[in-house]
Regions:
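Residues within helix-turn-helix
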Residues: 41, 52, 88-91, 101-102, ...
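A short, Lys/Arg-enriched amphipathic alpha-helix from helix-turn-helix/homeodomain DNA-binding modules
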Residues: 11-37, 68-87
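…primarily DNA-binding HTH/wHTH and HhH modules…
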Residues: 106-125
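Short hydrophobic/aromatic patch on the recognition helix
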Residues: 54, 58, 103-104, 108
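Non-catalytic interaction/regulatory modules that flank or connect domains
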Residues: 32, 36-49, 53-56
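Residues within the alpha-helical elements of helix-turn-helix
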Residues: 46, 95-96, 111
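Terminal helix-turn-helix DNA-binding modules in bacterial transcription factors
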Residues: 60-99, 121-125
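The C-terminal output helix
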Residues: 1-3
């Protein structure tokens, strides 16, 4: 199931083309989430836009840069694996494209306000 991306600011009117772009970005992220080497250039090529145009469009629609969006998607996806109880924090970090479990844990804590281990404790299935 795709992760939710919070769109901001609320005043932004989203056209069908914008929604199509966001859905395409989310599909690409879903398909490539485990790849630690994905780049913004690859995403731009996939959606058929130049890097700068895509940056401006994604930033305008989501309030996040493409890099921030990729990271947020990975961290949201990690919650799915952590909640399942089937994967350790390290295994989860690799499944969502982090090559360094320590960096994953720090990023997770910064994003959610708690460590992955605490998240697991609070969300036992």
């Amino acid at each position: 199931r795709p992760s939710k991306v919070k769109l901001a600011p609320e005043e932004v009117v989203i056209t069908d083309r914008d929604e199509e772009l966001i859905n395409k970005v989310l599909k690409w992220l879903e398909d490539n989430v485990a790849d630690a080497e994905i780049t913004v250039d690859q995403l731009a090529a996939y959606v058929g836009m130049g890097r700068t145009s895509m940056y401006n469009k994604i930033k305008g629609l989501t309030g996040k840069s493409p890099v921030e969006l990729i990271q947020a998607f990975r961290l949201e996806k990690a919650t799915f694996y952590l909640k399942s109880g089937q994967f350790s924090v390290s295994e989860t970090s690799y499944k969502v494209g982090f090559s360094d479990p320590g960096y994953f844990s720090r990023s997770f804590k910064k994003h959610f306000g708690m460590s992955p281990a605490d998240y697991i404790k609070e969300n036992k299935a």
